[in-house]
Amino acid sequence: MVDVVMAPCSPVECRTAVVIDVLRATSTIVTALSNGASGVIPVKTIEEALKKRKEGVLICGERNAQKPKGFDLGNSPLEYRKEKISGKTIVLTTTNGTQVIERIRSEEIIAASFLNLSAVVEYLKSKEDILLVCAGTNGRFSLEDFLLAGAVVKRLKRNDLGDGARAAERYFESVENTREEIKKHSSHAKRLISLGFEKDVEFCTTEDLFKTVPTLVNGVFILKEFP
């Protein structure tokens, strides 16, 4: 079965979990690994992140969209350029995305974004029990995460859909332009734009820049690549 859940407050269980935080955690994870980072370690708190500082490690993330004091990078994927992060381990803490990862009980967890949409779909074709976990925003529904979930469901072309997956697929089918839909109607996108992150929204709504599938292994996202 394929299903979609939004901003779970309690643990969720499945065989293959796909964590989605379009704006911006999973987009940043995909970008960082695609640009040469050796791994991304998601953590819940700022304090936990700072404790992991050592040579070869970058402390990164945001609270309320802004880079915390003492951090090397924020949560803008545009900051994660090859010359800054290649060969480095990223410790990432964010308001939404890294929090929801802690609630997933799954045999495997992968990170999805529009940036690696086709690679994620290809990876999932061989999987049976799939749960698309939308991070949401501060525990609430996020339009952009649900829209990406719908895009994944649509491309998988499966019949064994839960109600959440059917709703996400129908929403995706109703949208003519995903980027414009997000920019015009997503409250989180509007807030990021008001804070000066319009380029982030543009970047995070770009499809298939990367052929990579970040997979969580022993608490670290590492890269899976497809030809």
Swiss-Prot record:
Record family assignment: Belongs to the ComB family.
InterPro entries, per database record: ComB-like, ComB-like_sf
EC number in record: 3.1.3.71
UniProt GO MF annotations: 2-phosphosulfolactate phosphatase activity; magnesium ion binding; sulfopyruvate decarboxylase activity
Designated name of the protein: Probable 2-phosphosulfolactate phosphatase
Keyword Protease: no
Reaction it catalyzes: (2R)-O-phospho-3-sulfolactate + H2O = (2R)-3-sulfolactate + phosphate
